[in-house]
Regions:
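Short beta-strand-to-loop acidic/aromatic patch adjacent to the donor-nucleotide binding site
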Residues: 127-136
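Short, charged/polar "capping" segments at the starts of alpha-helices
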Residues: 48-52, 76-81, 168
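Active-site-proximal specificity loops/subdomain of glycosyltransferases
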Residues: 74-126
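Conserved catalytic core of nucleotide-sugar-dependent glycosyltransferases
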Residues: 139-225
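A conserved hydrophobic helix/loop-capping motif in glycosyltransferases and polysaccharide synthases
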Residues: 38-47
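Short, well-formed alpha-helical segments that are part of the catalytic scaffolds
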Residues: 47-62
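C-terminal catalytic/acceptor-binding lobe
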Residues: 210-284
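Membrane-proximal basic amphipathic "stem/tether" segments
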Residues: 1-34, 284
Length: 284
């Protein structure tokens, strides 16, 4: 076993054992922020050839304007892979209770998949924008072209399938949004689908403060609703919803059970439609 492997396993033990490690680290005094103003976070609990290859593809696409990070959900069976040395930002289930507020339910799924981003933001809050991309998202085109398409889009929250209550009144997660003393009528709530999204520094700060204030809920209703209520600007990658810009209708994804972006069923691979986001890809 090499010295680096020993170091990684030691880190893994500290993470799982509760000692202070990378997942709870804060910026060191005097550390200079990255000159790039955007962070691109690739979120995964899986480490294999396909996942690493996709992370590399995205990293190459954003290298001129963003700093990539591999957000790894570390568990006892997480494999060591030296190819990710120095690029992993690890976290464990313990972050769900480590930020002075708790999740809607005591697990990342369902509905708390934004907690790794909130944890990262608490550590590295100097970026202006944050992209979050789940490991099973693919783009059937040039990732660089995709990111460049939104460089000038001034939105605090850029995601997919944004809809109002009237668009899908029977959606099961509307009632999950709650607060001990405050109430937002379901008719004024928004939903979104967030396997990939971009969010501003100010919006993340507001979400953190909202959680500390007592708001909880599935993040697909919590994020868009609380941001719109506070006057933040929302935008959609494509699709057919009322918040989609006319020139982006169905441009980067299609909706529905037969669409390119959906909760299920799984796609075996990205395609055959060109320049579209696909989720979920489960040939892993």
């Amino acid at each position: 076993m090499t010295a680096f492997q020993k170091g990684f396993r030691g880190l893994l033990g500290r993470l799982l054992g509760g000692s202070r490690g990378w997942s709870t680290a804060r910026p060191r005094p005097g550390r200079q922020p990255d000159a790039r103003k955007t962070a691109v976070l690739f979120l995964s609990h899986v480490v294999n050839d396909d996942v690493i290859a996709e992370y590399r593809k995205i990293s190459e696409a954003v290298k001129d304007f963003a700093r990539p990070h591999f957000l790894l959900h570390v568990r006892p069976d997480t494999p060591f892979d030296a190819r990710l040395a120095g690029e992993v930002y690890p976290f464990t289930d313990k972050i769900l209770r480590a930020m002075r507020y708790g999740p809607w339910v005591d697990s990342f799924v369902p509905g708390s998949a934004h907690f790794p981003l909130l944890h990262f933001f608490a550590d590295q809050n100097h970026y202006e924008q944050y992209w979050l991309i789940e490991f099973d998202v693919r783009f059937s085109g040039d990732w660089r072209r995709f990111f460049e398409s939104f460089r000038t889009v001034e939105a605090d929250f850029l995601t997919s399938c944004i809809r109002r209550h009237a668009d899908e009144p029977d959606w099961c997660w509307w009632p999950s949004l709650s607060h001990p003393k405050k109430f937002i009528p379901e008719t004024k709530r928004l939903g979104s689908f967030n396997p990939i999204y971009r969010i501003s520094n100010a919006a993340l700060k507001h979400l953190s403060e909202s959680h500390r204030d007592g708001w909880v809920g599935h993040f697909e209703v919590l994020i868009p609703t609380l941001l719109e209520q506070q006057g933040f600007k929302l935008a959609d990658f494509g699709g057919q919803g009322s918040l989609v810009a006319p020139d982006r209708k169905n441009k980067f994804y299609t909706e529905g059970t037969d669409g390119t972006m959906r909760p299920c069923p799984c796609h075996a691979e990205a395609g055959p439609q060109a320049d579209k986001l696909y989720h979920p890809i489960k040939r892993l």
